[in-house]
């Protein structure tokens, strides 16, 4: 059974646990890479999601989300303030509003957990994965900060090539629920549940360790591909300057021409040319002509 009552706990303590747990989750990602903190953060969220009072659980989840997203997407302040020209106050406000919007998805998770009285770790993980899918899809999506990314250096990395980041996110939430259940069972001296949860983690950990030794990619015999990655290294304060556009185009044109006929594939950054395609049609036409000749 996965349940923790907070009826006798001060609401301020619950809210504080939620907020701190959300902030802690950011340190599971790069450049910090403390992957184990993902389980601590999610454990805190699961702790508040099972609150007996729905309103308290939802508000606590909102605070968890604000702690998680405000710190997790704080890098946007650089783009908005330093390069977008907005004041620092407006920049923080916009990041806060974005975080408040992103908080709707964890709150949906808690709402569904409360409505359906969820007890199963698998169902917890399934609901969370569903809300993460929605976060990455609605309004074109904002799929940053999925917990699956934190586990690439963990002992469970072996299952990443099989299930991808979505599967790893599912597993991370499932494991967090199992670990939380294990700790709760230990505190209550429910030794049968302790054994079951410990066995589950050992089995999955063993399978992951085995999968980590499997080579999922086999080299193909014959001639390989020559791939070139072009990088203009253009400073952000110049990249979006309209007067610097043609200098940018010239930089990439020289890099491309230097490798045409030598490389099978040339890849540019997704925002290498900061303009509409029809604004630099001659550039593409010239490249197309040279490519056909080579």
Tell me what each language-model feature is.
Residues 1:
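Nucleic acid-machinery interaction/catalytic patches
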Residues 7-215, 265:
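Membrane-embedded alpha-helical bundles of multi-pass enzymes
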Residues 211-294:
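Soluble catalytic regions of membrane-associated enzymes that act on cell-envelope
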């Amino acid at each position: 059974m996965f349940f923790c009552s907070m009826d006798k706990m001060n609401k301020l303590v619950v809210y504080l646990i939620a907020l701190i747990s959300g902030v802690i989750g950011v340190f599971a990602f790069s450049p910090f890479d403390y992957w184990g903190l993902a389980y601590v953060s999610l454990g805190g969220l699961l702790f508040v999601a099972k609150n007996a009072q729905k309103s308290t659980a939802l508000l606590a989840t909102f605070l968890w989300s604000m702690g998680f997203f405000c710190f997790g997407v704080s890098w946007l302040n650089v783009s908005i303030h330093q390069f977008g020209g907005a004041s620092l106050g407006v920049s923080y406000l916009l990041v806060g509003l974005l975080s408040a919007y992103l908080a709707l998805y964890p709150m949906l998770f808690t709402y569904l957990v409360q409505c359906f009285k969820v007890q199963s770790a698998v169902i917890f993980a399934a609901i969370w994965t569903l809300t993460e899918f929605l976060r990455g899809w609605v309004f074109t999506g904002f799929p940053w900060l999925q917990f699956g990314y934190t586990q690439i250096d963990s002992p469970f990395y072996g299952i990443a090539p099989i299930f991808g980041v979505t599967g790893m996110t599912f597993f991370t939430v499932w494991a967090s629920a199992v670990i939380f259940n294990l700790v709760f069972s230990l505190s209550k001296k429910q030794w049968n549940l302790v054994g079951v949860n410990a066995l589950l983690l050992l089995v999955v950990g063993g399978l992951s360790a085995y999968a980590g030794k499997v080579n999922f990619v086999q080299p193909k015999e014959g001639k390989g591909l020559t791939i070139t990655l072009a990088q203009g290294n253009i400073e952000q304060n110049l990249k979006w300057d309209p007067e610097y556009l043609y200098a940018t185009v010239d930089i990439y044109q020289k890099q491309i021409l230097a490798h045409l006929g030598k490389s099978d594939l040339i890849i540019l950054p997704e925002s290498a040319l900061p303009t509409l395609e029809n604004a630099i049609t001659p550039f593409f036409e010239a490249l197309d002509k040279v490519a056909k000749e080579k």
